[in-house]
């Protein structure tokens, strides 16, 4: 361990050890852009990644919105952005109603937005009932960590930023074990679908180099957009069209030159103009889906899709920040599940990613569902993912699943009426 690493870890330990259990905060949650809590203190960059910077009981009534939750905390922590510069993020920790929390699940919500005010720590108050996996995990006695992994700039689809933020959220939560009252050696795992799989998968890749001290029990991910170009080319003109402006604004949020270029290529007038495109900066995923549905997003650009897909300044970001499989080999057991007919995230790219990982020793159960599409698989794959996570977090994985190497299964699971 070098002197710089030792100094950062010492500062981190000192800061966390002086944190007292917080009292109740304000009664009404504020949007992150209006809440002073969503800031980092001066000189925070000298602390180690994962250091807790602020800590509070979540405002409002999350415990009455989310079943099986006894208390909720908001945690601001130090992390690292896609440029490998110090940054910060916020996570929400839900504590189960049952005593003696037995495991920690980091649940990456696919919030898919270029607006910081649509981050989970705020939208859980309105959207929480739409995520039944959360009370299910709490009902099993698990702590549930829900990070705002896009960070303070809402860098949607920026995988490196998102992966760092997930890893550091778990570091932050584990450092508070004494204050909150759970074992620091609790087993922990990740779960994410679609946009949540981006953050989870990048965290798994980056863990080897960025957080080598961490030892995950496992990771379940589904609906993987292995390459951002998958979203950009597949979504425009259809149901998911809102993902295109949101992801382009998200991946350029940390790159001012790229953002300025993107804006410069938007049409100044007409039915598809810059004002309409930039509305996505303030839209939640649901708002963007409603506003842009069936629009050909390339109509907003002076020269159509070539202004984006052929632009070196955009391509550089995509290759640096938005393609899975190039930052390390995940070391934990993995469940990967995807619909063969996924219209948003082509399964051929997931096949290739899994094959690459399996070729270098990864432990993966890969389930290819022959029924349904992207939305349907969110539900179709859910029960199996939770069962798999119960095994890895409950210590029964080796007895139920293959502990080494890879298993590829073509399955036919249909528990939803969704046609896509």
PLM region spans:
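Catalytic-loop region of hydrolases
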Residues: 15-100, 420
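Accessory cap/linker subdomain of secreted extracellular hydrolases
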Residues: 222-327
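C-terminal catalytic histidine-bearing segment of alpha/beta-hydrolase fold enzymes
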Residues: 306, 310, 315-318, 344, ...
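Alpha/beta-hydrolase active-site loop
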Residues: 132-133, 156-179
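Short beta-strand/loop motif that positions the catalytic acidic residue
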Residues: 330, 335-342
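Primarily recognizes the serine-hydrolase "nucleophile elbow" in alpha/beta-hydrolase
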Residues: 171-243
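Cleavable N-terminal signal peptides of Sec/SRP-targeted secreted and luminal proteins
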Residues: 2-20
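Short, surface-exposed "cap/lid" segments of acyl-processing enzymes
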Residues: 81-137, 148-150
